Amino acid sequence: MVMGSHLCSKLQALSSKIKQASVSGKWREVVSGYSEIQRAGVQFNDPFVFPIVFKACAKLSWLFQGRCIQASLLKRGFESFVSVGNSIADFYMKCGDLCSGLREFDCMNSRDSVSWNVIVFGLLDYGFEEEGLWWFSKLRVWGFEPNTSTLVLVIHACRSLWFDGEKIHGYVIRSGFCGISSVQNSILCMYADSDSLSARKLFDEMSERDVISWSVVIRSYVQSKEPVVGLKLFKEMVHEAKTEPDCVTVTSVLKACTVMEDIDVGRSVHGFSIRRGFDLADVFVCNSLIDMYSKGFDVDSAFRVFDETTCRNIVSWNSILAGFVHNQRYDEALEMFHLMVQEAVEVDEVTVVSLLRVCKFFEQPLPCKSIHGVIIRRGYESNEVALSSLIDAYTSCSLVDDAGTVLDSMTYKDVVSCSTMISGLAHAGRSDEAISIFCHMRDTPNAITVISLLNACSVSADLRTSKWAHGIAIRRSLAINDISVGTSIVDAYAKCGAIEMARRTFDQITEKNIISWTVIISAYAINGLPDKALALFDEMKQKGYTPNAVTYLAALSACNHGGLVKKGLMIFKSMVEEDHKPSLQHYSCIVDMLSRAGEIDTAVELIKNLPEDVKAGASAWGAILSGCRNRFKKLIITSEVVAEVLELEPLCSSGYLLASSTFAAEKSWEDVAMMRRLVKERKVRVVAGYSMVREGNLAKRFLAGDKLSQSDSELNDVVQSLHRCMKLDDTAGPIN
């Protein structure tokens, strides 16, 4: 009798210990306490302890131990208690064994509101939104009510599945849950994803707003491209409502600064976050700061934040890497990647995209192939952004066929990947293939796709295809409303020689910018109408448009092709006076203009006196060499220029061919032989020039020295006739 009393006291002590451990969250002690009871070998009949034990197993994810405890209870009939059955079902649902949880629910003789909430919550918590909402509807049919936690998840499921938010909102009001802060904030989140006006209306109606409410409505405005309103709300939150923001709020505000591209306001928010202690302690704030500074073209400040932060993750690394790429500091981007490797940071798809942009800039084929291997090994082949970036990098590295292989391997060819491939093929001069890809696209083309198509039309210089592309742009309402598309149409017509159609399209663009003006000026220049090009240049300035470096280059090209040396030098002088720093292209254009006019000595003098930060390229020296050939300058000057050209581009065939032609014009046959010998010794790959003519729907090439073309006597007669015409002007005199 004494023994029985002692054992009873011990069981009561263990029971109290289990309950106390659960209050303190010491779940291992709960399970070990229950194990002691089992080792005592006596029947334990306190049904209130079993739910605590199953809760502990769920917290620890101890599925096997929970099953064993359930088996012992099954023998003793404790599962008939609703509270015990609920705890077992909840244990299985939280351990991820949803089937066992549902089976336990089906086996329960009686169920209460908790039973239904356990099932609905478990399904929704594991992402089974549709199944969870189906069980939620059954719960209501049987007359039970959800608890707050379940209702919050139901609202989240409606938000994920884009169900009618107003219906669930109505249910919340009818059920009397609208006064609960967590439920109100969940409804607010649901509206914030799609309707900032409804979110603001609900926010204004809320009697009590906490930091979550403010953060959600601020984020809603930022996502809706209304960052200014979001910033105003942030000021109201801090100064008027006296609500202390948290890291989530600051992250949304920094995103607003990024969208606005207002780095000054961003710095103020950075200072605010420092005073609140958010800048280094929270990884989301740090990453938002890095992104804000990078996109605000202050990557040095972005790197300082990255360097000082104590809580980096892969997003931090990707943000600073993308920042260097965005600011075109590709060498530093590579250094960051090497640092990632040293720190053993695992790369992801975002890292791959940034690295491919670096490869695109350096035009390095081997790194592209290496990254392609990484994409395959890591299983990123389903990532459309990564594959589109790979296609873009391959085409930039002249690996168009490899890019085509990547496109063919994609199960779903989205509009971005197709647009990238079309642009790459156009850049490679393969316009027919580019147009073919456009015709086989399944998605509706966007403005970028149409621009890529128009670029292909520019390359083919086929007027009929350009008109067809123009028609597509009109049907998509892009020809007039989208300035980039309209400008591309102007360029396509100009390249086809249809200058009147180009001008008509230009006049139809409702809101012109400096790019559209530059394109139409260039259009007249390349079509042999320099006077009209320069008249447009003057008209543009009169209308208040400030020419940029490319506009000046178009005007200088017009002077160059028209032989207007004085006008060209005047434009160049005005460019310098207006604080536009001339680039190598501008100097090369002036050199070419002087060389064509026979002022070889002046051109050489200009090259030798270029600014320190501008180094003459092969194109500038090549222009002088071409001038030497046409003007039969002294062999000393020719030899000097040839040496410069071959030093700058020792493996480019055009320099050797031009030098050989120049020496031949001067009848220096020894030098001609030397050029041919150098080509063989240096293994220079000679790329044959070609002309294109459209026959039917195909563009055909005629290569220089093509024996098949020369065997066609009729075609050969036409070519010889054209050759004679090119050597004569209207007065039958030689062209200089």
Swiss-Prot record:
Pfam families: PPR, PPR_2
Keyword match Ribosomal protein: no
PPR repeats: 10-44, 46-80, 81-111, 112-146, 147-179, 180-209, 210-240, 246-280, 282-312, 313-347, 348-382, 383-413, 414-444, 446-480, 482-512, 513-547, 548-582, 583-613
Any GO BP annotation: RNA modification
Region of interest called Type E(+) motif, as start-end residue ranges on this chain: 697-727
Superkingdom, natural source: Eukaryota
Keywords: Repeat
Type E motif: annotated span: 620-696
Protein name: Pentatricopeptide repeat-containing protein At2g17210
Cystine pairings recorded for this chain: none
Protein family per UniProt: Belongs to the PPR family. PCMP-E subfamily.
GO terms of molecular function: RNA binding
